[in-house]
């Protein structure tokens, strides 16, 4: 995902 490539589907 985003926000530091976190393993979660964050919007962005």
Swiss-Prot record:
Highest taxon listed in the record's lineage: Eukaryota
Protein localization: Secreted
Single GO BP term: innate immune response
Principal place of residence: secreted
Protein keywords: Amphibian defense peptide, Immunity, Innate immunity, Secreted
Any single GO CC term annotated in Swiss-Prot or TrEMBL for this entry: extracellular region
Family recorded in the similarity comment: Belongs to the frog skin active peptide (FSAP) family. Frenatin subfamily.
Protein name as catalogued: Frenatin-2.1D
Organism from which the protein derives: Discoglossus sardus
């Amino acid at each position: 995902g985003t926000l530091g490539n976190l393993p979660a589907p964050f919007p962005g």
